[in-house]
Amino acid sequence: MSVLVCGSPYDLGRTSCTCRTFRTLAAVALRQRAGLCSGGDAPLPEGEASWTQLLFWRERRRPRCGDVLAAGRMHSAFADAEGRLLTCGTDDDGHGFLGHGDEAAGGSITTPLPLESLGWPLVRVVAVAAHTMHSLALSADGAVFAFGQGRCGKLGHGEEATEWLPRRVVALEHEHAVGVAAGQQHSLVLTREGGVYSFGSGFAGKLGHGDRSNRLLPRLVEALRGVKVAAVAAGSYHSLVVAEGNAYSFGDGVMGQLGHGDRHEHLAPKRIAALERIQSAVGGENHSIALDDSGALL
């Protein structure tokens, strides 16, 4: 057993060849060592294709807790299985979206690095969002943290200052958040009760408040009051929400990304009549994608 736990790839290979019973255990150990980048190259020992293929299939089917990630223009954010928040990327202009303090400004972090200032393990991150110049993190207890460039109020802190470290959005302390989304200059937060808060740039009405005004603090989207929202998504200049199988969109529609059959901007959420039985949606710079309950992409 000690060989399986800490043996070298060569020891593990010899073990698998000595006894067929140990082949699956040896293969698991080799895959884990390779996944942790320890021990160098660790090819699977030779054997019948059937058991190695079965093992690989089982690994692919196994639930994973660490697949929480988001991509901005020049950075990425991750949450591992233990709830640690990690980021990597390049912040040449010093916008703070990596969350490692001003000492990281003007440089690159090429390997995901934990954000120690967030206070893990007291704060465990379960969701992340990122866009060009800011990042959002959601903790297991429903708290929202924002950092990066604060222009237009997209961090929700009531000001436009740059935040070099993750800072809790105090205005949402009375809510239990379950989802976050980051757009070009705006942010969306979904609460446990199905409410949606938006803040940041109001360009083209993408905050959903019926106007084009910026919001420095989170504000509840009143047009969605009474609608049980299940998911939120932010494109660069538009926003999407999913509720009870319906999809709603608002903001800039110049490229048809709102799905309403026109190219107009919509200042408040409007249901997309062409979509039904929708499970989730995502927004890009000038397009939107929805997934229905049959697994079809639209």
Predicted regions and their residues:
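Eukaryote-biased RCC1-like beta-propeller repeat architecture
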Residues: 1-298
